[in-house]
Curated annotation (Swiss-Prot):
Residues the record lists as binding S-adenosyl-L-methionine: A32, G33, H34, D52, F79, D100, Q107
Protein name as it appears in the record: Ribosomal RNA small subunit methyltransferase H
Disordered: region residues: 287-311
UniProt gene name: rsmH
Cited function: Specifically methylates the N4 position of cytidine in position 1402 (C1402) of 16S rRNA.
Catalytic reaction(s) noted: cytidine(1402) in 16S rRNA + S-adenosyl-L-methionine = N(4)-methylcytidine(1402) in 16S rRNA + S-adenosyl-L-homocysteine + H(+)
Stated induction or repression of this protein's expression: Transcribed at a low level in exponential phase, it may be further induced in stationary phase. Part of the mraZ-rsmH-ftsL-pbpB operon.
Enzyme class: transferase
InterPro entries named among the record's database cross-references: RsmH, SAM-dep_MeTrfase_MraW_recog, SAM-dependent_MTases_sf
Single GO cellular component term: cytoplasm
Principal subcellular localisation of the protein: cytoplasm
E.C. number: 2.1.1.199
Organism whose genome encodes this protein: Bacillus subtilis (strain 168)
Record key words, sorted: Cytoplasm, Methyltransferase, rRNA processing, S-adenosyl-L-methionine, Transferase
Length: 311
């Protein structure tokens, strides 16, 4: 059963300013929480196109959203191909798009997917099970320098060198096969005082490997650009991020596209061609309420940013 508590449900969907006859995109279908709430607000003319690369999520959505067959189009794909698949559907512009980044609870909670440092399972971490690169390959075959780079860049792990060295020493004896083995190596590499603070000692390294396996940051950056391109004037994009790297991409993109360019001094009116592409709906990110945090601890690190296309 695909059970997943949706984060910032109403804030994200209501922030899109739903038009009942509009066309919307959920780039991260997951447990279908956002999609369900959005579909409930559409008329028979409204449409939702939902992306996911996880077969389990798509099958679950087919079952729970069977009442909305006429309005819902499910696409098995990474959202980096957003424009391509919209074109296939004959869709050139949409009224709203949402992204809920990060791993869905069922992926985290299914040990054999290899995302979780709480279960011993084969090293995997592929969002798309048909993809070739897995966590096992990264851990066992990538060079020491590359491991240090991803642990530091994607995990902001200050003990990156020590952890990469431990991995290198261990894999020379025999391949590292499971998440449990990797967790033990990480714990051995981190000094005891540091292990006792800042959450689970493997959290940052697991995040870094997952981002590398799925090329998450580049994929998101590309997809966000495409999303803004296909929005109608007045259309909105809602983005939920779960760590500072994703949030930085979103914040920077929104800021660049909502800022005025350098203009000659003394212009009485800003020429239309110089008006920024976006208007910020949220100056500061929206975070989960205390009530939501009590029900769903995974919402703690969630940040929601919303922008509207001006032209």
């Amino acid at each position: 059963m695909f059970q997943h508590k949706t984060v910032l449900l109403r804030e994200t969907v209501d922030g899109l300013n739903i038009k009942p006859d509009g066309t919307y995109v959920d780039c991260t279908l997951g447990g279908a929480g956002h999609s369900t709430y959005l579909l409930q607000q559409l008329s028979e003319k409204g449409r939702l196109i939902a992306f996911d690369q996880d077969d389990t999520a798509l099958q679950h959505a087919k079952e729970v959203l069977s009442d909305y067959k006429g309005q819902l189009i499910l696409i098995k794909s990474n959202f980096r191909y957003l424009k391509e698949y919209l074109n296939e559907q004959g869709v050139t512009e949409v009224d709203g798009i949402l992204f809920d980044l990060g791993v869905s609870s069922p992926q985290l909670d299914t040990p054999e997917r290899g995302f979780s440092y709480h279960h011993d399972a084969p090293l995997d971490m592929r969002m798309d099970q048909s993809a070739t690169l897995s966590a096992k390959e990264v851990v066992n075959e990538w060079r020491y320098e590359d491991l240090v780079r991803i642990f530091f860049k994607y995990g902001e792990e200050k003990f990156s060198k020590q952890i990469a060295r431990k991995i290198e020493e261990a894999r020379m004896k025999s391949p590292i096969q499971t998440t449990g083995q990797l967790v033990d190596l990480i714990k051995d590499a981190i000094p005891a005082p540091a292990r006792r603070s800042g959450g689970h000692p493997a959290k940052r390294v697991f995040q870094a490997i997952r981002i590398a396996v799925n090329d998450e940051l580049r994929v998101f950056e590309e997809a966000l650009e495409q999303a803004i391109e296909v929005l109608k004037p007045g259309g909105r994009v809602s983005v939920i991020t779960f760590h500072s790297l994703e949030d930085r991409i979103c914040k920077t993109t929104f800021k660049e596209k909502s800022s005025l360019p350098e203009l000659p001094p003394g212009l009485p009116v800003i020429p239309e061609e110089f008006e920024p592409e976006l208007k910020l709906i949220t100056r500061k990110p929206i975070t989960a309420s205390q009530e939501e945090l009590e029900e769903n601890n995974r919402a703690r690190s969630a940040k929601l940013r919303i922008a509207e296309k001006r032209k």
